[in-house]
Amino acid sequence: MAVVIDGKAKAASVTEAVRKSAEALEAEKGVKPGLAVVIVGNDPASHAYVNSKSKMAKQCGFNSIQHTLPEETTQAALLKLVGELNTDASIHGILVQLPLPKHFNSDEIIQSILPEKDVDGLSVLNAGKLATGDLATGLISCTPAGAMLLVRGIHGDDLSGLNAVVIGRSNLFGKPMGQLLLNANATVTMAHSRTKDLVTVCKTADILVAAVGRAAMVKGDWVKPGATVIDVGINRIAAPEKGEGKSKLVGDVAFDEASAVAAAITPVPGGVGPMTIAMLMANTVIAAHRALGKTAPKF
């Protein structure tokens, strides 16, 4: 049976380190790290995410500001708000909760955030720094950064000689995850919906990362014996065993099957998810240090 990787415990240790770092910064400079979270519309899942981010920011001792805008907000109005946050020296991190309502050009909004305040790591500049191997001066997308910390907890910092397969090529996760693994010297294969003979590709992986958004797609026989499996999927499915109309969260990996074969595996929930918010806090305290001319902490 695989070791179940405890994302909650790792996230708690990261947020405690962030809290101490924020405390020391405030003691020295008299400045709290400032995080502004912007949400548009009424999507309940987005509101739940934003509330947990704002709550965690307060626990870390940040100046946490939430802007909740109505569904009918215009592109121009949102761009104006981002512009104001860009020039506000008390705000070190800006996060616009995605997905935005359909009438928005999300990319224009995201790219309008100053790269040094882009704590989601989605600006072209931050993505480019990661792609060129600069892990020191940019901000790295939170979910891959968190997943990578879990990988390093199992394998250490140097992944030389290990094969890694990432299923999923999104800008939000797949591409930056591939870059992080590559920067740690893994041999990386990027797989996706058009990959030929996906099962065979996956079976080569010492580190298998699934981020496709399809419940239990990765079966036990896709997993190389002794592999580390990182499950980034969050899928809500019906759970009649819990009662009529009930649902549960599952990942992209068939957990019971895969955990019989793998050496280590992340659960859903409680694996990569908690790491995402922890790394958002880490990025915010890093951005605050840089803004104040201080050497940023490492996590």
Curated annotation (Swiss-Prot):
GO terms for cellular component: cytosol. Gene3D superfamilies: Leucine Dehydrogenase, chain A, domain 1, NAD(P)-binding Rossmann-like Domain. Pathway: One-carbon metabolism; tetrahydrofolate interconversion. Keywords: Amino-acid biosynthesis, Histidine biosynthesis, Hydrolase, Methionine biosynthesis, Multifunctional enzyme, NADP, One-carbon metabolism, Oxidoreductase, Purine biosynthesis. PANTHER family: C-1-TETRAHYDROFOLATE SYNTHASE, CYTOPLASMIC, C-1-TETRAHYDROFOLATE SYNTHASE, CYTOPLASMIC-RELATED. Belongs to the tetrahydrofolate dehydrogenase/cyclohydrolase family. Homodimer. CDD domains: NAD_bind_m-THF_DH_Cyclohyd. Catalyzes the oxidation of 5,10-methylenetetrahydrofolate to 5,10-methenyltetrahydrofolate and then the hydrolysis of 5,10-methenyltetrahydrofolate to 10-formyltetrahydrofolate. GO terms for biological process: L-histidine biosynthetic process; methionine biosynthetic process; purine nucleotide biosynthetic process; tetrahydrofolate interconversion. It catalyses: (6R)-5,10-methylene-5,6,7,8-tetrahydrofolate + NADP(+) = (6R)-5,10-methenyltetrahydrofolate + NADPH; (6R)-5,10-methenyltetrahydrofolate + H2O = (6R)-10-formyltetrahydrofolate + H(+). NCBIfam families: PRK14188.1 (NF010785). InterPro entries: Aminoacid_DH-like_N_sf (IPR046346), NAD(P)-bd_dom_sf (IPR036291), THF_DH/CycHdrlase (IPR000672), THF_DH/CycHdrlase_cat_dom (IPR020630), THF_DH/CycHdrlase_CS (IPR020867), THF_DH/CycHdrlase_NAD-bd_dom (IPR020631). GO terms for molecular function: methenyltetrahydrofolate cyclohydrolase activity; methylenetetrahydrofolate dehydrogenase (NADP+) activity. This is Bifunctional protein FolD. It comes from the Bacteria. It comes from Agrobacterium fabrum (strain C58 / ATCC 33970) (Agrobacterium tumefaciens (strain C58)). NADP(+) binds at residues 168-170, 193, 234. Pfam families: THF_DHG_CYH (PF00763), THF_DHG_CYH_C (PF02882). Its EC number is 1.5.1.5, 3.5.4.9.
